[in-house]
Amino acid sequence: MADAAMSGEEKEEDGGKRTTAATPAETLGFYEPSDGSRVETKKRSLSDLSLLRFISAELTRGYFLENNEAKYKERREKVYTCLRIPRELEKLMVFGFFLCLDAFLYVFTLLPLRVLLALIRFLTLPCCGLSDGRVLQPAQVCDVLKGVILVICYFIMHYVDYSMMYHLIRGQSVIKLYIIYNMLEVADRLFSSFGQDILDALYWTATEPKERKRAHLGVIPHFFMAVLYVILHAILILVQATTLNVAFNSHNKSLLTIMMSNNFVEIKGSVFKKFEKNNLFQMSNSDIKERFTNYVLLLIVCLRNMEQFSWNPDHLWVLFPDVCMVIASEIAVDVVKHAFITKFNDITADVYSEYRASLAFELVSSRQKNACTDYSDSVSRRMGFIPLPLAVLLIRVVTSSVKVQGILAYSCVVLFYFGLITLKVLNSIVLLGKSCQYIKDANMEEKLFQPPTCQPGKTPKKAQNKSKPNQGHPPDETANTSVTSQPTKAASTAQLLVESNSDKLLTTPDAEEKDISGDNSELKQKQADKDLLDIDRFTICGNRID
């Protein structure tokens, strides 16, 4: 029995050894291997760390992009957005350029005719009498003031010696001229921001109702301030044009290169800042104004250079490469700047269509029968483009560069004037057609017939607090008159601060306004008013002049 038990134990030990030996092959190493297998595995791992095997692993290593599909789709959309930015931006720039051109041509074409009609009305007043108790309509008073300012500033500009200014600037060093040009750009923006306020103050002071108690300096002081502003701004632009002319005529073109490199510094100052849609709209309007002003400066430089070379057409081809280089650098800087701003702030390229629709809405609204402000003043407030100083300078340069002698020359001047009128009319018609198309594409037709939110003699915040009992009504139901309807006499005797409907389109959607109620609607309205201050460059309101 003992032998049998011993033999059973030996069998069990043999079986255990057999199972233990077979376990590593069957269980793939779930049990601890023996010492021999450890040594063999270590030798195999050391042999796996060879350089060739590492290179082979790097060359054959795979990965699966579909595991992070959402991230890669987002990156692809950003690339597509950057590719769409140049096209959408240039559409906005072209539309804005023709808006500025329309306001600029108005000074040369329709403004003299409107002043002439106002003078005819004034001279025929004893025969016709006063139909509505006024000598001139408010719009006619503003036109006469613009015409008088234009004529006075033109004659004062004759005392500015362009040749002396050119040689004075040419004698300076390159670095000093670069600093001067940068200072002139900053001063131009400051003048533009304050100049329209001076002109608006003059227009309202001259047309304010007589029965109201006047708390201002009077028309004459405001008029002299406006003349002084236009003169200083015109001289500032003349110095800019002279500096650019010196850069064009320099032998090594180093100054022109430095001035163009200044545009690329603008990328550094704006790309890495946080931008909202409203801030980007403000910057886009500033870029439109800057590009149009640069084109007029280039025109002035070409006129002065062609006069110095006795209008030799061969010299025009000498200037052509430099002009193209300046324009190309300006376009490249704008494209790169807007592309990276939209990329870093997650703004789609469709936002430029909204900007274009907003400008179109302002254009169509300002063409209404009873608009709150003149169209050229609306462009000035929106883009910071004031055409009067630039028009004074261009007239001064053209009259000094082109000599008109003889009947044939005067006939050419008359034909040229009629050509400008034709261009102005065609440009206005095309702009109105395009604007209506943009408004239709943006589904904004019904907003053209909504009245502006106005309160006489109140700021927007005070007017909002006064209208708190009517918060239960939707915004669309508070409308009781049309934009094209005739205003009442009581409303015409007060200064109305008008909130632009196009600004509201970029801040508060209609669907959200109809759903919210009570305190939420008040909070939304306050937020919209805060955003409007960011959208408009100088003021969110147009003063109604009646």
Curated annotation (Swiss-Prot):
It is a multi-pass membrane protein. Its main location: cytoplasm. It holds the Pfam family DUF747. The chain crosses the membrane at residues 92-112, 149-169, 219-239, 316-336, 384-404, 413-433. GO terms for cellular component: centrosome; ciliary basal body; endoplasmic reticulum membrane. Keywords: Cell projection, Chondrogenesis, Cilium, Cilium biogenesis/degradation, Cytoplasm, Cytoskeleton, Developmental protein, Differentiation, Membrane, Osteogenesis, Transmembrane, Transmembrane helix. Residues 478-505 have a biased composition (Polar residues). It is found in: Cytoplasm, Cytoskeleton, Microtubule organizing center, Centrosome; Cytoplasm, Cytoskeleton, Cilium basal body; Membrane. Residues 514-529 have a biased composition (Basic and acidic residues). Plays a role in primary cilia formation. Involved in cartilage and bone development. May play a role in the differentiation of cranial neural crest cells. May act as a downstream effector of hoxc8 during development. Belongs to the TAPT1 family. This is Transmembrane anterior posterior transformation protein 1 homolog. It comes from Xenopus laevis (African clawed frog).
